[in-house]
Amino acid sequence: MEAPMKLEVKVENYVECGINEDEATPLREGTGETPPHAFACGVPMSGSGWCSDPEDGNLVHHSATPTSDEHLQPSLDTIEPKMEPKIKEDADNAMLDSLLADPFENNSPATLQTPADVKPNAMLDSVEQGSRSCELLPSEFSKRENLDDMDLFSLKAAKTLVPDEQQSFPQNDTPIDDPEAADLIAQKREILKMLEMTAENRKVKHKKKKHKKERSHRSNKHQEESRKRNHSNSSSDEGADDKNQFDCDYRGHKKYKNRRGSASSQNESSKERKLRDTELDYVPVRPDEHFIRPIKFSNLIERRPPQVEFNTVNLSKADKRSLAVARAELVLEQIQQKANKEEPPEFHMVDTICKLPVNESFRNQDCFENPSPICNNMNVVYKFNSTPGTRIDLSKWGLETVPEATKRLLRLLGIDVARLKELQSTVKPSQRILKLKKEQLEQGLAPTEEQETATLYKNAATQTERRTATRDAGTQVRLESKLNGAFWQNPHFDPMNLTQHQSNVMLALQEIYQTLPSATMAVKLSRALAPALAIIKGRQP
């Protein structure tokens, strides 16, 4: 077991000492450099701590913490007067000040007095490596405040100190051999050029401010004149007011037009106008831009050429004849393409070969005239017999087959079977076709389609009744005579609900037929057919 360690924590209340903390602390002139052996291992920490001074020399003593009653004891050291802080000047600034303050004489050799902190070899390179602004001056002198505070000569006095390029050589035309003197002259010339540029910029800014003041003064004068004109009761002023009512922009601000004979506009030259326009902080608004004309988004979009829609309702005999000729030519072209085994450029799509019942067909008994086994009505029973020799009228059911040549022709013409039946009932065939049919009937050559029967053979799949019929019952569609089912157990059941449900089924079938296939319809159908699928899966072994 390790022995417990005792730690004594001494809490000291720092009371106000003899030195007031609110007073500004004087800056130190210099700090003692850290000895190289200060952080070496095995060396005592001498010359550091609370009571250590750099003048102690080799005296070794440990740093002691200040006691609590130390501030009550009289201080033995005399309080020295506060020294004003010395601002440390930058090396670049000091060198530039010395360059500007040093007068140049052609006879005496040029010497550069550098401060103590700057190396003697650092000439123009040290100045160029410093931070520079966009005006090729150090960043300390690029600000306006620093330029105003600089203690420099005026431009005229500085030009007298630096000789021009023509006077750079002495009278005996001997060039200066000292390269340092030539560098000094070049530096001072550059500084003078930069100072001239800053002075010109100040003049331009002063002109801009002066122009702005003049503009504001002119606008105030115009406002006062307009107020005086509005208060006058003369007839000429009234006519002017009536005209000025229309000289307003959409924001209600009046436009004041300068007179052509005003002295300010006549004296103003084109250069001054261009200068005034360039001095503006905003883009002037043209007179045609005062009002915004909204444009419809439909006008911005490129319009498609209008498609010509043929009038198929009220056609004249000439139009019908031209359409029939065009249709026949197109059919002949497609037949020729198919004979040459070419890829057809277009196809005629037919919706269906059979018609669905019309809405409210239960009440009108239309759906029972030509029903379809595809539509399984709620209140209709379809009954088939398996007696051989039974002929089912497929045209009644909407399942009539046509010859192969007729199928191809119908596909080319884009006509369905229902439309073909309508044409057969309305259109009268030609005498040639009637003569051919009559000859076939006389010879006993009936069409093969009429001889075919739709007998359902005896097998387990075709039996709809438990017992096989022994007589020709035929194919019939009848209403349920006996009401049997879950609905009829309730004596208060209204049969009209079933008829309404029947019409709803017809409408739903029409919607399913007319709409395009979508994922939502597939989900609805799968939910409705889920019980039937479960029954079929349960029957399978």
UniProtKB/Swiss-Prot annotation:
Region (Necessary for interaction with nxf2 and protein stability): 387-446
Start-end of Basic and acidic residues biased regions: 241-251, 269-279
Biased composition range(s): Basic residues: 203-220
Molecular function as annotated in GO: piRNA binding; transcription corepressor activity
Signal peptide residue numbers: none
Keywords from the UniProt entry: Coiled coil, Nucleus, RNA-binding, RNA-mediated gene silencing
Tissue distribution of the protein: Expressed in female gonads (at protein level).
Known function: Acts via the piwi-interacting RNA (piRNA) pathway which mediates the repression of transposable elements during meiosis by forming complexes composed of piRNAs and piwi proteins and governs the methylation and subsequent repression of transposons. Required for transcriptional silencing of transposons targeted by piwi and confers its effects by interacting with nascent RNA transcripts. Likely to be recruited to nascent transcripts cotranscriptionally by piwi and to recruit additional factors involved in transcriptional silencing.
Note, other: The name 'panoramix' derives from the mentor who empowers the French comic book character Asterix to perform his feats of strength.
Stated name of the protein: Protein panoramix
Originating gene: Panx
